[in-house]
Amino acid sequence: MSDENYRDIALAFLDESADSGTINAWVNEFAYQGFDPKRIVQLVKERGTAKGRDWKKDVKMMIVLNLVRGNKPEAMMKKMSEKGASIVANLISVYQLKEGNPGRDTITLSRVSAAFVPWTVQALRVLSESLPVSGTTMDAIAGVTYPRAMMHPSFAGIIDLDLPNGAGATIADAHGLFMIEFSKTINPSLRTKQANEVAATFEKPNMAAMSGRFFTREDKKKLLIAVGIIDEDLVLASAVVRSAEKYRAKVGK
């Protein structure tokens, strides 16, 4: 068959059906199955509104749950007051909360914390002594008052790696100091590992979060300033610099 025949075949697709229903169905079938914060915000708002809920209040409750109890809502209900268990049961029902290996349209507590990280970083400052790795513990490890806003994996989502003078990389390393302790706490098999081995378990997810484009660079800058990681001149807080130095020493960077 000649090149011209192949060209005619391709051109004939001009007359092929391109109905929106079929195309949209394919879009859903082929959609990225990883974490999409925009989609999580959309689903939370839609599901909460559909049930007549104060969905913003529910978001805050889900974040607090995630910060202090983890990512398994059904399991945590077994060791909770009757009133607390009832609230969690309602959240599970309304928002179809899941755990484990979620698909694109699955809402988990950790995904809520990550998607709504502007509130998560505020809650961390209030809850620092109720977290799996406490603020006091991190202060002892860092040798300074460790930035509370960094004390959750979701913080990676507001790190701007393109900040001038390597500030973004320094923030990422400072956050890594917490992530080493957090990873060992939630995964006992890592407790006997070297720091660089533990770091290897979270580096890729952290990089994916830092590379996300849900929040603009301007958004990230505003958030980092708001929680005291950088100042208006984009200068790092001294505690961030010290924490990053500790991390680098631990992992041999």
Swiss-Prot record:
Pfam families: Tenui_N (PF05733). Changing residue 32 to A: Reduced RNA-binding affinity. GO terms for molecular function: RNA binding. InterPro entries: Capsid_Phlebovir/Tenuivir, Nucleocapsid_Phlebovirus. RNA binds at residues 32, 35, 68, 72, 110-111, 191, 201, 204, 211. GO terms for cellular component: helical viral capsid; host cell endoplasmic reticulum-Golgi intermediate compartment; host cell Golgi apparatus; host cell nucleus; ribonucleoprotein complex; viral nucleocapsid. It is found in: Virion; Host cytoplasm; Host nucleus; Host endoplasmic reticulum-Golgi intermediate compartment. Keywords: Capsid protein, Helical capsid protein, Host cytoplasm, Host Golgi apparatus, Host nucleus, Ribonucleoprotein, RNA-binding, Viral nucleoprotein, Virion. Homodimer. Homohexamer; ring-shaped, necessary to form the nucleocapsid. Homopentamers; opened pentamers in solution. Binds to viral genomic RNA. Interacts with glycoprotein Gn; this interaction allows packaging of nucleocapsids into virions. The N-terminus is involved in homooligomerization. Belongs to the phlebovirus nucleocapsid protein family. Encapsidates the genomic RNA, protecting it from nucleases. Displays high affinity for single-stranded nucleic acid. The encapsidated genomic RNA is termed the nucleocapsid (NC) or ribonucleoprotein. The ribonucleoprotein has a non-helical structure. Serves as template for viral transcription and replication. After replication, the nucleocapsid is recruited to the host Golgi apparatus by glycoprotein Gn for packaging into virus particles. This is Nucleoprotein. It comes from Toscana virus (Tos).
